[in-house]
Amino acid sequence: MNIVVCLKQVPDTAEVRIDPVKGTLIREGVPSIINPDDKNALEEALVLKDNYGAHVTVISMGPPQAKNALVEALAMGADEAVLLTDRAFGGADTLATSHTIAAGIKKLKYDIVFAGRQAIDGDTAQVGPEIAEHLGIPQVTYVEKVEVDGDTLKIRKAWEDGYEVVEVKTPVLLTAIKELNVPRYMSVEKIFGAFDKEVKMWTADDIDVDKANLGLKGSPTKVKKSSTKEVKGQGEVIDKPVKEAAAYVVSKLKEEHYI
């Protein structure tokens, strides 16, 4: 069994700031992490490796520093890593990104492709399904459980008010959610060992793709501006006996027409 896991290195949203003039994310000085849903996808691939001897390859698109996410994935237990990095990929929206990653995946052997449900720096949930379309394989999204029976997978797909169980044959793309598992910790030995492993670097010339579909040229959508919500509320400390405090809260709620 060969598994490919799509990873994205994203800024830690707990420390994200917005440039008030440009309306863009300020990434300088902000620590980066593996996108959380992608980490669940990787963990499930590693579970299948533990149980069935699967070979796990991680792939990412990004600048050279995105290699850090792939090294972390190798430390967790991935067998191989590929970074798609080229200035031609810059400015890509979800469509151009999916074109690029799918072209990279086509160079690899795969039975299952895992991706996270969505990235925390965009929240579109588009790249995984788009990759499946470019590869011409079925997809199951919002996956919260995976069972293997030969070349057939039994998948539990989450819905807002329940779940659905589906069976699908490989090859298939699955998008993971946090309920799927708890990602493992890395051992010190594996962390040091990961730095000795090769991360393959592929440019636009290394993949079979129409360059008109890459980067800014291949992106039909443009982000004009990003912003954070302005916090308008204010707190008030009520220093009164319990009954008086309760009456005061009720009066305030009525005053604001909440009750």
Curated annotation (Swiss-Prot):
Signal peptide: none
MF GO annotations: electron transfer activity
Membrane-crossing segments per the record: none
Keyword Glycosyltransferase carried by entry: no
Keywords, alphabetical: Electron transport, FAD, Flavoprotein, Transport
Quaternary structure annotation from Swiss-Prot or TrEMBL: Heterodimer of an alpha and a beta subunit.
Family as reported in the entry's similarity comment: Belongs to the ETF beta-subunit/FixA family.
Biological function: The electron transfer flavoprotein serves as a specific electron acceptor for other dehydrogenases. It transfers the electrons to the main respiratory chain via ETF-ubiquinone oxidoreductase (ETF dehydrogenase).
Protein name (record): Electron transfer flavoprotein subunit beta
Biological source species: Clostridium acetobutylicum (strain ATCC 824 / DSM 792 / JCM 1419 / IAM 19013 / LMG 5710 / NBRC 13948 / NRRL B-527 / VKM B-1787 / 2291 / W)
